[in-house]
């Protein structure tokens, strides 16, 4: 053994020499093919897609896309020459595949002349790096295609969140004839050559950053470069994609001891530092910037950041992240610098220090050559620049100032006024009175009660301090003591009637409590209706008990003019409890299953809600309890606005025709030509802007589907986002459609899928609930207002919370006053959307509730509470199956144009002829509705004008009813003996019918009438 070692060493050196010689030759070919992009000043969004040849074989984008179904996105073009009568040819494919589980996918050989599949195929050697295959050249000489990632193309739409992980790849099959195999084994095989590797379209291309280096190439670099980590500075034009391997570009170019970038004035310039933990894991990686200097001119290091290690969160708070890189893994560190608009042109030099635990500091000199040209938008319009990464740290709209229609707050003694809401506080800091619209919500002051071994303890006396922090924020702080227990209460009261409470409860020593109870008593009026904590919604039951089982953390008690929404807080996630986001309940309130909430009291009497923790232990350090209140309605219902805005919800090509029937607002959904991918409406720009400009000529508005919950794989910054290690992209098992498997590889969670034209697809990823992507999303909204002149957005079940909605509305008022937000939800997905989204309602213009709303099964009180939006200050439209056009008008609701079996246009025509925009809406739910019916299942809503009245009748029962109407003629301003009651003809709704005052009116089950009452002519 000792004698053999020198021979082994010599052999290894020989191998290394040969490998390096091959690599050098490949580098020359690589440089030859990419000479047009060798100068960094010319790098752009096309650079990474230029042909390259890491093994002397070019990787290119095909000049014509082939059919993806059964073939896939990648192929090798193989040339067979001089086959003569050979029954088998052999070809080596250095494909450098990044996908996992390559041996689980079929290798498909297709005859280029006949397009027929070659069945006699034998795989001799196979790995991620390369394969050696033998196949029968059935047409002898010619071109053959080897599809090495074939899959079944998925049609239509689907959702990868549910069920087993998707695997659309074709599995390996052995169809080769045994006699043919025997001939191959006898060696009757000739060589074929690989002309090139092709990607079906540019988006599918692996790029030099997506193909793996071989193990030998990695070992070579490890032998040459002994430092750990090995560092690869990289321009933003070549996003770092891989994490399990280094890319072929790095294997060819090797690491660099410096970085040179090229920027324009006012550009937000980004670049990357690739960290390869080649020899050992790297812990706590930190980048330290220096100033950039050009003589006396300086760009301060304060203008630089590394997005992976620091930033400003969605709530405006600064944070730092710890970056660790496991052994043999790759981590991209994305960096950015704001180039001042007035900076002198020239070359600015500085350095980056790379710190990590247990490793020497590495210093990378950097220089950025700055051109005199000014980039007006900082680079936001050129997605490839990744300038928008700075949006991740934006604080846009984050302040404590009121936004329309809300006003500045005032405070006098213990009374706080938030626009039309008045809150009075007890000495202990809890509300003693909440009034809105002349209605009192609380029958008694709210209070906290401790049940101890020695009886009950309440907190009444304290030192209350109320401070106006800003025009839109008032805080109230109180400390109460009783029998040795201390209660510290801090309330943040905002301009829209939102109140956030933080309570800290302490004992002088560790003390066992029987219970901690928060008690609220609501007036009879303000507790008629109820929803939340496991109750779907409607008239309040005499008693409802909830023990924290199920995805709920809030409830609402109220009526049309006064109500209160209550949310238990204490966890990290405070957005709507969607199927994607079901955090554990707040620990202090749920108390390991011992907590419960009880709502009790006979209908039309006071209602008491008691949140009880059950037995718990109190310590000198204290227990924390949090909750939110929101006074409803958040704002007055604007019926004029509602009836003057009529929605079309279908492909944009039909909008002009729908406008002839009254539609004046379009929502452009995703998966449409002008908005093809989900939640990233930045790819199609020119045609979208042209469409918006066209509609503006006719005073029509254009809104886009734009939300947060999932994000398309077409996002330009997707690899930068993945480098943030689940801050933004949720963790998961991977899989999903082939593109995700081939480019993101693993460690992501697939979501919504939509087929796009030409066998392409939009494959979304689930996002983490709260992250800096919210900041990006809001800046994207601002950008669309400024660049598209967009008129608003359509939100579909989102995962952010009320503070984000505040920021959104402030952005609207600053950059596009009058822009609109409408919210759609799926009651099977968000489990009671009206309750889940109550905190959004001060800032929403309209609801579209919604999917899985089964209108014909809902009682009137369910319609009112869960659908109408009216108790919260807005109105809604019907979605599921077009809703019920008869019952909907009781709440002022129709379906949207082109969404449902019946057009709303005939009802819109009646609105127009009657002038409903200027009418006062008085629903059956109001105490003074001037038209009543004789049957509890038949409801009447009045649209009152000075000289005439429109009455919407709806029979919510399951059988036909005959009813009489009882009129308050004085309030209607009409005389009974001088009026006529007419049901005008409305297509698909009713035929013309005349009724006399006092006459019985038949109303079919689940149908109704639209009656106009006016003086006889």
Name what the model sees in each region.
Residues 139-152, 992-1017:
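C-terminal beta-strand-rich structural cap/linker in extracellular carbohydrate-active enzymes
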Residues 162-189, 367-430, 626-681, 685, ...:
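An acidic-aromatic substrate-binding cleft motif
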Residues 362-364, 471-474, 558-726, 903-909, ...:
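Conserved structural scaffold segments of CAZyme catalytic domains across common CAZy folds
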Residues 183-199, 315-324, 334-341, 372-622, ...:
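Beta-strand/loop-rich accessory regions of lumenal/periplasmic or secreted enzymes
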Residues 704, 708-783, 788:
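Active-site-adjacent "subsite" loops/lids of carbohydrate-active enzymes
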Residues 43-226, 231-249, 255, 260-343:
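Alpha-mannosidase-like glycoside hydrolase catalytic domains involved in N-glycan trimming
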Residues 620-621, 809-812, 816-983, 1007-1010:
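Active-site-proximal substrate-binding groove within the catalytic cores of carbohydrate-active enzymes
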Residues 60-97, 564-566, 932-974:
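Carbohydrate-binding surface patches
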């Amino acid at each position: 053994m000792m004698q053999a070692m020198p021979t082994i060493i010599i052999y290894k050196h020989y191998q290394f020499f040969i490998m390096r010689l091959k690599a050098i030759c490949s580098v020359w070919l690589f440089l030859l093919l990419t000479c047009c992009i060798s100068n960094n000043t010319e790098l752009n969004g096309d650079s990474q897609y230029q042909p390259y040849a890491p093994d002397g074989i070019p990787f290119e984008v095909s000049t014509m896309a082939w059919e993806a179904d059964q073939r896939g996105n990648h192929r090798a073009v193989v040339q067979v020459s001089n086959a003569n009568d050979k029954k088998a040819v052999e070809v080596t494919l250095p494909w450098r595949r990044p996908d996992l589980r390559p041996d689980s996918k079929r290798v498909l050989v297709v005859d280029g002349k006949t397009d027929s599949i070659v069945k006699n195929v034998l795989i001799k050697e196979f790995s991620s790096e390369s394969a050696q295959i033998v196949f029968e050249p059935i047409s002898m000489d010619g071109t053959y295609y080897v599809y090495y990632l074939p899959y079944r193309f998925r049609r239509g739409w689907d959702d990868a969140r549910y069920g087993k992980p998707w695997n659309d790849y074709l599995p390996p099959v052995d169809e080769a004839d045994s006699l043919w195999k025997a001939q191959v084994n006898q060696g009757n095989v000739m060589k074929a050559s690989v002309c090139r590797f092709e990607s079906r379209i540019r988006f599918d291309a692996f790029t030099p950053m997506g193909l793996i280096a071989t193990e030998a190439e990695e070992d070579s670099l490890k032998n040459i470069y002994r430092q750990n980590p090995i560092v690869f500075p990289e321009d933003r034009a070549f996003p770092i994609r891989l994490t399990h391997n280094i890319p072929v570009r790095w294997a060819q170019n090797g690491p660099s001891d410096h970085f040179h970038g090229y920027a324009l004035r006012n550009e937000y310039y980004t670049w990357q530092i690739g960290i390869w933990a080649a020899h050992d894991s790297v812990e706590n990686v930190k980048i330290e910037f220096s100033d950039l200097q050009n003589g006396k001119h300086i760009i301060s290091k304060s203008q630089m950041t590394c997005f992976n290690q620091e930033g400003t969160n969605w709530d405006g708070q600064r944070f730092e992240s710890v970056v660790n890189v496991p052994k043999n893994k790759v981590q991209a560190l994305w960096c950015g610098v704001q180039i001042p608009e007035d900076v002198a042109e020239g070359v600015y030099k500085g350095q980056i220090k790379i710190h990590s635990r247990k490793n020497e500091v590495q210093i990378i000199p950097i220089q950025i050559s700055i051109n005199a040209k000014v980039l007006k938008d900082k680079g936001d319009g050129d997605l490839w620049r990744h300038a928008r990464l700075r949006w991740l740290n934006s604080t846009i709209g984050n302040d404590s100032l009121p936004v329309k229609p809300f006003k500045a707050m005032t405070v006098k003694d213990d009374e706080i006024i938030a626009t039309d809401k008045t809150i009075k506080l007890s000495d202990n800091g809890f509300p003693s009175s909440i009034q809105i619209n002349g209605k009192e919500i609380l029958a008694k002051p709210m209070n906290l009660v401790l049940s101890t071994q020695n009886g009950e303890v309440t907190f009444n006396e304290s030192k209350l301090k109320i401070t106006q922090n800003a025009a839109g924020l008032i805080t109230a702080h109180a400390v109460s003591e009783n029998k040795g227990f201390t209660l510290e209460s801090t309330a943040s009261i905002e301009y829209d009637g939102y109140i956030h409470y933080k309570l800290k409860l302490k004992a002088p020593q560790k003390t066992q409590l029987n219970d901690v109870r928060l008690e609220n008593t609501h007036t009879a009026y303000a507790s008629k209706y109820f929803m939340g904590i496991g109750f779907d919604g409607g008239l309040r039951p005499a008693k409802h008990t909830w023990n924290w089982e199920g995805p709920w953390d809030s409830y609402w008690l109220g009526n049309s003019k006064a109500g209160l929404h209550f949310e238990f807080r204490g966890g990290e996630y405070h957005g709507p409890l969607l199927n994607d986001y079901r955090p554990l309940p707040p620990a202090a309130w749920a108390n390991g299953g011992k907590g419960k909430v009880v709502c009790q009291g006979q209908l039309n009497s006071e209602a008491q809600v008691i949140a009880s923790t059950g037995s718990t232990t109190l310590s000198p350090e204290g227990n924390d309890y949090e909750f939110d209140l929101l006074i409803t309605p958040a704002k007055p219902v604007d019926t004029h606005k509602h009836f003057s805005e009529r929605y079309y919800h279908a492909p944009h090509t039909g909008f002009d025709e729908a406008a002839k029937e009254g539609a004046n607002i379009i929502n452009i959904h995703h998966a449409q030509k002008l908005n093809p991918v989900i939640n990233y409406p930045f790819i199609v720009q020119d045609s979208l802007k042209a469409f918006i400009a066209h509609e503006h000529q006719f005073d029509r508005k254009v809104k886009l589907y734009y939300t947060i919950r999932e994000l398309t794989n077409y996002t330009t910054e997707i690899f930068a986002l993945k480098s943030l290690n689940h801050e933004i992209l949720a963790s998961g098992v991977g899989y999903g459609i082939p593109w995700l498997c081939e480019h993101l590889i693993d460690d992501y969670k697939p979501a919504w899928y939509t087929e796009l034209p030409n066998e392409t697809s939009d494959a979304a990823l689930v996002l983490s609930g709260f992250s800096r992507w919210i900041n990006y999303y809001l800046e994207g909204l601002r950008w669309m207002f400024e660049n598209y002149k967009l008129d608003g957005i359509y939100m579909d079940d989102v995962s952010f919370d009320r503070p984000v909605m505040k920021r959104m509305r402030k952005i609207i008022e600053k950059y596009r006053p009058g822009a609109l937000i409408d919210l759609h939800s799926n009651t099977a997905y968000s489990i009671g959307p009206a309750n889940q989204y109550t905190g959004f309602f001060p800032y929403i213009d309209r609801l579209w509730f919604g999917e899985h709303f089964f209108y014909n099964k809902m009682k009137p009180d369910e319609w009112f509470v869960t659908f109408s939006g009216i108790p919260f200050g807005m109105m809604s439209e019907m979605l599921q199956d077009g809703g019920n056009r008869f019952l909907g008008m009781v709440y002022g609701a129709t379906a949207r144009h082109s969404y449902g079996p019946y057009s709303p246009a005939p009802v819109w025509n009646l609105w127009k002829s009657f002038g409903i925009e200027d009418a006062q809406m008085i629903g059956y739910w109001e105490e003074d509705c001037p038209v009543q019916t004789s049957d509890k299942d038949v409801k009447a809503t009045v649209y009152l004008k000075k000289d005439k009245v429109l009455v919407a009748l709806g029979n919510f029962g399951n059988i036909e009813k005959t009813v009489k109407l009882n009129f308050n003629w004085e309030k209607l301003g009409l005389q009974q003996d001088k009026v006529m009651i007419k049901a005008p003809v409305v297509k698909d709704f009713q035929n013309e019918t005349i009724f006399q005052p006092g006459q019985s009116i038949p109303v079919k089950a689940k149908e109704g009438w639209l009656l106009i009452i006016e003086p006889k002519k």
